[in-house]
C-alpha cells in the first residue's frame, strides 16, 4: 500500500472516474463505477482513429481477469474492490489472500445474481459499447485471460444484444473464452447472432489431442497450465482448430491467439483465419487473399490450397516435390513467397494453364502464389 497520495503522472488510468471523495488504496480518491473516465475513453477513441488510418484493429477487452485471480497486488488497487469505490460493492474485506499474496475473487465477481454487482456490470458493459460506438475498427471482447463461467459469458452477450436492439448499432464482437463455453454459445441460435468473431485463445489442439480448461473453475490460464499438460503444438494443430470453426460457422471470422500462435501465421491464413501473423511483401497479394477461400488440404497434408478462380491461388508446401492442383483455364504468373520475410519472387512470368498445373517444390515450408492475369 502507498504511504500517501503523493504520486506523479502518468497514472494507470482506469475506465471509471475518480470522485474526489474518500481515499482509495492507492492514496487517491475513490472511483465511481457508474461514471466513465472521459480522458480514458478519449485516449481509446484517439488510438482507434489513428489505428484506422493504418488498418489496425483495437481489441477492447472489457475486463481484465488478472485483477481478480492470481496476483493480489492487482486486486488491492482494483476499482471494484469495496475500499476503492463509492458504489458499495460487497466483496469480502479484509481481502482474503491465499498465502499472503494470491487472490481468488472470480466466483464472487462473476455472480450475476448479486443485486449490487449485476446492475454495475450491465452499466459498465454498456459504457464500453457507448464510448466506442463510432469506431468501426474496434472489436469488443469480454476479458483478457478469461476463463470465467458460461453464465457470465451469456450475461455479457445478452447485455450487448439489448444495447444493439435499443441503438440499432452492431459493433464487432469476438467470443473469446474457454472451448466449452464457446461451443455452448455458438449452439445458442439467439446469442450466436451477436458473435462476429470466434477467438481461439484459451484452448488449443496438441499432438495428443486437446488442451481445453473448463469454464468457471476459478483458475487463471497460467494456473490451468500448471495442472494440465499443455502439450506440443504445430502447424497442423493450429490449422485444424481454425479450419474446424471456419467450416462449422462460415459466416463468422475466426482468429487464433492460442499457444505459440506467432509461429503459425501461415497455418491460420491457409485455414481461413483472420488477423494471421504473416509477412506479405505484395499489396496485390494481400488484396487477392481477402477474396480467396479453402480449396484443398488438411492440417497434416503435404500442401494446403486456397484460391478464387477470378484472382488466382495460394499453395503452402511443406516439403520438396511436385504439387498438382486443379485451376481455372487462363494465364497466370507463378511467384514464390518467403514465409518468413514475405519477399515475393517471380518464378514464371506467364503460364497458359488448362485444367491442372504442377508446381515443382524446391524447398520446405514455401508458399506459392499463382496470380491470375
Q: Whereabouts are the PLM-identified features?
A:
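A sequence-composition feature that detects small, non-aromatic residues
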Residues: 3, 9, 15, 24, ...
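Aromatic- and carboxylate-lined catalytic core of secreted/periplasmic carbohydrate-active enzymes
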Residues: 222-350, 356-373
Amino acid at each position: 500500500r502507498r504511504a500517501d497520495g503523493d504520486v506523479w503522472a502518468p497514472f494507470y488510468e482506469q475506465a471509471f472516474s475518480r470522485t474526489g471523495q474518500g481515499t482509495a488504496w492507492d492514496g487517491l480518491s475513490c472511483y465511481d463505477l457508474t461514471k466513465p473516465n472521459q480522458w480514458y475513453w478519449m485516449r481509446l477513441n484517439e488510438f482507434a482513429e489513428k489505428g484506422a488510418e493504418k488498418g489496425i484493429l483495437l481489441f477492447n477487452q472489457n475486463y481484465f481477469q488478472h485483477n481478480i485471480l492470481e496476483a493480489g497486488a492487482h486486486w488491492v488497487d482494483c476499482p471494484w474492490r469495496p475500499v476503492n469505490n463509492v458504489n458499495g460493492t460487497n466483496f469480502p474485506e479484509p481481502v482474503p489472500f491465499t498465502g499472503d499474496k494470491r487472490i481468488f475473487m472470480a466466483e464472487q465477481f462473476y455472480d450475476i445474481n448479486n443485486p449490487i454487482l449485476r446492475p454495475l456490470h450491465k452499466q459498465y458493459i454498456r459504457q464500453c459499447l457507448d464510448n466506442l460506438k463510432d469506431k468501426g475498427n474496434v472489436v469488443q471482447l469480454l476479458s483478457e485471460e478469461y476463463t470465467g463461467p458460461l453464465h457470465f459469458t451469456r450475461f455479457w452477450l445478452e447485455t450487448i444484444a439489448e444495447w444493439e436492439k435499443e441503438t440499432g448499432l452492431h459493433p464487432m464482437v469476438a467470443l473469446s473464452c474457454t472451448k466449452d463455453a464457446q461451443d455452448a454459445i455458438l449452439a445458442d441460435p439467439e446469442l450466436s447472432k451477436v458473435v462476429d468473431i470466434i477467438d481461439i485463445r484459451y484452448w488449443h489442439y496438441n499432438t495428443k489431442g486437446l488442451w481445453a480448461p473448463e469454464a468457471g473453475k476459478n483458475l487463471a490460464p497460467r494456473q490451468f497450465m500448471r495442472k494440465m499438460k499443455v502439450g506440443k503444438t504445430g502447424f497442423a494443430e493450429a490449422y485444424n482448430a481454425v479450419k474446424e470453426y471456419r467450416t462449422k460457422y462460415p459466416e463468422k471470422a475466426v482468429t487464433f491467439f492460442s499457444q505459440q500462435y506467432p509461429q503459425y501465421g501461415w497455418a491460420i491464413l491457409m485455414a481461413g483465419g483472420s488477423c494471421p501473423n504473416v509477412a506479405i511483401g505484395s499489396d496485390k497479394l494481400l488484396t487477392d487473399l481477402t477474396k480467396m477461400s479453402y480449396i484443398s488440404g488438411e492440417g497434416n497434408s503435404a500442401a494446403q490450397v486456397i484460391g478464387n478462380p477470378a484472382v488466382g491461388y495460394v499453395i503452402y508446401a511443406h516439403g520438396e516435390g511436385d504439387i498438382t492442383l486443379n485451376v481455372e483455364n487462363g494465364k497466370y504468373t507463378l511467384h514464390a513467397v518467403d514465409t518468413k520475410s514475405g519477399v515475393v519472387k517471380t518464378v514464371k512470368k506467364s503460364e497458359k494453364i488448362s485444367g491442372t498445373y504442377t508446381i515443382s517444390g524446391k524447398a520446405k515450408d514455401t508458399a506459392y502464389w499463382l496470380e491470375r492475369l
